[in-house]
Amino acid sequence: GFANNPGAFTLSSLATATNAVLQAGGPNSGGSFRSVKIHRNGREIADLDLYRLLRGGKRDGDIVLQNEDVLFLPPVGEQVAVIGSVQEQAIYELRAGETLADALRLAGGANVLADADRMILYRTSDTTNSEPIEVLMADAATRPAKGGDLIELLSRGTLLQPNSITPRKPASRKNAVSTS
C-alpha cells in the first residue's frame, strides 16, 4: 500500500499493528492515517485509525499481529481544512460519517480567542453554491463534513455577513511592486 517503506518485515512475537506501521516508515504522503487495514487469512480483521493514537493516545484497534498477517495502507481519504481560532490549523483526513464538530475536535478544538457560537463553512464541493455558510456550533455535531470543506472558526468579535464575502484577485508582480 501507501507506506514509505513497503515490504515484508520480521517483527517480534509481541509486535502490534502500530509497530509494523512504524517499521514500514508510516504512511507516505498519499497514504491514509485513518484506515490501516489488517488482514489475516485473507480477510480483514481490523481497521486501525492512527489519528486515535497520535491525537488522543488511544490504542484501541492496535492488535497483536500473528505470523503472515498483512497490513495495507490505502490511499488518503477525503480531507478538510480547519483554520482560524483553533489549537492546530491543518488539513485533516475524514472517516465516513464524521461531522463538522469531529473535524473541529481533530484540530484540538477552539482556542481562547474563538467565537464559541459559530463557524464559517466554505463547501468547495458544492458547485451550485460557492457562498460561505455560517454554522452554529450547536448544529456542528449533526452537520456532515465533506471532502474539500474549509472550516473557519472565527475569533470573538469578528463581524461577518457570509453572503457579502467576495474573493480578492491575486496580486500580480506587475501591480504588487510600485514603480514610482
Q: Where in this protein do the model-derived segments appear?
A:
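Ser/Thr/Pro/Gly-biased, low-complexity, turn-/loop-rich segments
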Residues: 1-180
